[in-house]
Swiss-Prot record:
GO molecular function, one term: rRNA binding
PANTHER family per record: 30S RIBOSOMAL PROTEIN S13/40S RIBOSOMAL PROTEIN S18, SMALL RIBOSOMAL SUBUNIT PROTEIN US13M
NCBIfam families xrefs: uS13_bact (TIGR03631)
Entry GO terms, CC: cytosol; small ribosomal subunit
The name this protein goes by in its record: Small ribosomal subunit protein uS13
Subunit structure: Part of the 30S ribosomal subunit. Forms a loose heterodimer with protein S19. Forms two bridges to the 50S subunit in the 70S ribosome.
Entry superkingdom: Bacteria
Example of a GO biological process term: translation
Recorded name of the encoding gene: rpsM
Source organism (scientific name): Polaromonas naphthalenivorans (strain CJ2)
């Protein structure tokens, strides 16, 4: 099993798909990494040589991935909340921040519906 950036890459997957197991690497970036390392992206991870894996590790070291990327994202959101801007306020309240409607929908951000209080006499 190949280990890149502290992540075990599934050996039965193609190189392009296997690299997406690393947080911060999607399909496009994975394909570009394979092209830069001159590796066929359709080749299985288990069929890659140690030198191929070393090339991939060296190339991936240039990017912000995994824990550093998660930390950076969290710090960016925290900064928005600290400066008190609109987006930070929406993050704090758990609401969508890009202009979507919230009277109906927005259930992903708001969570399950809360039962309406009944008005019995």
């Amino acid at each position: 099993m190949a280990r890149i950036a502290g992540i075990n890459i599934p050996p039965q997957k193609h190189a392009e798909i296997g690299l997406t197991a690393i947080f911060g690497i999607g399909r496009t970036r994975a394909r570009k990494i394979c092209e830069a390392c001159e590796i066929d992206y359709a080749k299985k991870i288990k069929d890659l040589t140690d030198s191929d894996l070393e090339k991939i590790r060296d190339h991936i070291a240039q990017f912000t991935i995994e824990g550093d990327l998660r930390r950076e994202t969290t710090m960016n959101i925290k900064r928005l909340m600290d400066i008190g801007c609109y987006r930070g306020f929406r993050h704090r309240r758990g609401l969508p921040m890009r202009g979507q409607r919230t009277r109906t929908n927005a259930r992903t951000r708001k969570g399950p519906r809360k039962a309406a209080a009944s008005l019995k006499k």
